[in-house]
Amino acid sequence: MASQLTQRGALFLLFFLTPAVTPTWYAGSGYYPDESYNEVYAEEVPQAPALDYRVPRWCYTLNIQDGEATCYSPKGGNYHSSLGTRCELSCDRGFRLIGRRSVQCLPSRRWSGTAYCRQMRCHALPFITSGTYTCTNGVLLDSRCDYSCSSGYHLEGDRSRICMEDGRWSGGEPVCVDIDPPKIRCPHSREKMAEPEKLTARVYWDPPLVKDSADGTITRVTLRGPEPGSHFPEGEHVIRYTAYDRAYNRASCKFIVKVQVRRCPTLKPPQHGYLTCTSAGDNYGATCEYHCDGGYDRQGTPSRVCQSSRQWSGSPPICAPMKINVNVNSAAGLLDQFYEKQRLLIISAPDPSNRYYKMQISMLQQSTCGLDLRHVTIIELVGQPPQEVGRIREQQLSANIIEELRQFQRLTRSYFNMVLIDKQGIDRDRYMEPVTPEEIFTFIDDYLLSNQELTQRREQRDICE
């Protein structure tokens, strides 16, 4: 009978507890689903200790070696480690606190942090050259180290240093220096002529002789100035050497390098021309070439060279007015004489009484200076055959040349027309009625002048005013 009751009780208990272990899973519950098992294990929650502010030693008693813990408890002065007690930590002199300066007794019976006292030390002082030091207490706080130098050396700087609370040594590191500076002797001063067509000369010399009277050691030698073998410009140049020994003594010496440039007298440009020169234009080896303005031909040597005797070779040429040969076989032969020398303004009119022609010639005759300044030559083609006239200045052109010029430049006899040709023989502008000289000059200045002409125009801006 008792056995039957026991079996019934077990079945009842199993039936009653079955819903409590149903394998239901919730996110973050601490349970994990597993399709291959139906059993689960409930996570046991540890029991939190009962908090009691009356327990005198809720946390262990604080003891900090080489330091002190000053505690304040809510329960009074006799409670130094009860729940809620706060302790301020500090170290003895010569020690540094590592960790928390303030901790509190927590409900977990632990302090809120840890700390300890580390003995303060300074770094080991480095040895000094030609000297030594002795210390009273090694590298510990308040240790004093006194410096001394070897015989023949003098101490410069702090004679003693003390290890301070911040872990640093007081003062600065001294040095032992010898009394005598090194001996140095520079090479002799020298003079050299510049090379042909150059304004510089390459100069060499031997290094200075240096010796130290103390231990014979020279740490470095510095040069103030160009290195040996450098190119020196014209003039005097001071070269200075400075030698340093191991004790930082120094000695200096200097010498002078003088470079001379052989120069010729300054050349003057020819009248109605200009010069282009190499190098500086007046130094030994320089070449100056003579050029003539448009409308002028050079007569004489084209260039001169500055010689070692400081004199120019040859004699200066002159720029003579350009001679135009109108007795040529073709218009091409006529135009070749102006190539790269002159610009041409060719005027064509049906007869000398043409109103446009007379107006244009009148304006140009009043602007001959501006035309010459811009290297412009006027060619006139006026009238009808057989009375047609062609002229350049006072020279008459043949009928064949007149006809070829008209065909080359497409100039009609039927009405007034005019063409401007540049120094390369290219048609640059055409006019069907008179234009002022200022309009022609502006066009030439803006579009046709070479760099050399632009320079001359800036120099001669007011020459025609």
From Swiss-Prot:
<feature type="disulfide bond">
    <location>
        <begin position="264"/>
        <end position="306"/>
    </location>
</feature>
<dbReference type="GO" id="GO:0071625">
    <property type="term" value="P:vocalization behavior"/>
</dbReference>
<dbReference type="Pfam" id="PF13778">
    <property type="entry name" value="DUF4174"/>
</dbReference>
<keyword id="KW-0768">Sushi</keyword>
<keyword id="KW-0963">Cytoplasm</keyword>
<keyword id="KW-0677">Repeat</keyword>
<dbReference type="InterPro" id="IPR043555">
    <property type="entry name" value="SRPX-like"/>
</dbReference>
<keyword id="KW-0037">Angiogenesis</keyword>
<feature type="disulfide bond">
    <location>
        <begin position="292"/>
        <end position="319"/>
    </location>
</feature>
<dbReference type="GO" id="GO:0048870">
    <property type="term" value="P:cell motility"/>
</dbReference>
<dbReference type="InterPro" id="IPR003410">
    <property type="entry name" value="HYR_dom"/>
</dbReference>
<keyword id="KW-0654">Proteoglycan</keyword>
<dbReference type="GO" id="GO:0051965">
    <property type="term" value="P:positive regulation of synapse assembly"/>
</dbReference>
<dbReference type="GO" id="GO:0098978">
    <property type="term" value="C:glutamatergic synapse"/>
</dbReference>
<keyword id="KW-0964">Secreted</keyword>
<comment type="function">
    <text>Acts as a ligand for the urokinase plasminogen activator surface receptor. Plays a role in angiogenesis by inducing endothelial cell migration and the formation of vascular network (cords). Involved in cellular migration and adhesion. Increases the phosphorylation levels of FAK. Interacts with and increases the mitogenic activity of HGF. Promotes synapse formation. May have a role in the perisylvian region, critical for language and cognitive development.</text>
</comment>
<feature type="signal peptide">
    <location>
        <begin position="1"/>
        <end position="23"/>
    </location>
</feature>
<feature type="domain" description="Sushi 1">
    <location>
        <begin position="69"/>
        <end position="119"/>
    </location>
</feature>
<dbReference type="GO" id="GO:0005615">
    <property type="term" value="C:extracellular space"/>
</dbReference>
<feature type="domain" description="Sushi 3">
    <location>
        <begin position="262"/>
        <end position="321"/>
    </location>
</feature>
<dbReference type="InterPro" id="IPR035976">
    <property type="entry name" value="Sushi/SCR/CCP_sf"/>
</dbReference>
<dbReference type="GO" id="GO:0001525">
    <property type="term" value="P:angiogenesis"/>
</dbReference>
<feature type="domain" description="HYR">
    <location>
        <begin position="177"/>
        <end position="261"/>
    </location>
</feature>
<dbReference type="GO" id="GO:0042325">
    <property type="term" value="P:regulation of phosphorylation"/>
</dbReference>
<protein>
    <recommendedName>
        <fullName>Sushi repeat-containing protein SRPX2</fullName>
    </recommendedName>
</protein>
<keyword id="KW-0732">Signal</keyword>
<feature type="disulfide bond">
    <location>
        <begin position="149"/>
        <end position="176"/>
    </location>
</feature>
<feature type="disulfide bond">
    <location>
        <begin position="71"/>
        <end position="105"/>
    </location>
</feature>
<feature type="disulfide bond">
    <location>
        <begin position="122"/>
        <end position="163"/>
    </location>
</feature>
<keyword id="KW-0991">Intellectual disability</keyword>
<dbReference type="InterPro" id="IPR025232">
    <property type="entry name" value="DUF4174"/>
</dbReference>
<keyword id="KW-0770">Synapse</keyword>
<dbReference type="GO" id="GO:0009986">
    <property type="term" value="C:cell surface"/>
</dbReference>
<dbReference type="GO" id="GO:0062023">
    <property type="term" value="C:collagen-containing extracellular matrix"/>
</dbReference>
<dbReference type="GO" id="GO:0042802">
    <property type="term" value="F:identical protein binding"/>
</dbReference>
<feature type="domain" description="Sushi 2">
    <location>
        <begin position="120"/>
        <end position="178"/>
    </location>
</feature>
<dbReference type="GO" id="GO:0005102">
    <property type="term" value="F:signaling receptor binding"/>
</dbReference>
<dbReference type="InterPro" id="IPR000436">
    <property type="entry name" value="Sushi_SCR_CCP_dom"/>
</dbReference>
<dbReference type="Pfam" id="PF02494">
    <property type="entry name" value="HYR"/>
</dbReference>
<feature type="disulfide bond">
    <location>
        <begin position="91"/>
        <end position="117"/>
    </location>
</feature>
<dbReference type="GO" id="GO:0005737">
    <property type="term" value="C:cytoplasm"/>
</dbReference>
<comment type="subunit">
    <text>Forms homooligomers. Interacts with PLAUR (via the UPAR/Ly6 domains), ADAMTS4 and CTSB. Interacts with HGF; the interaction increases the mitogenic activity of HGF.</text>
</comment>
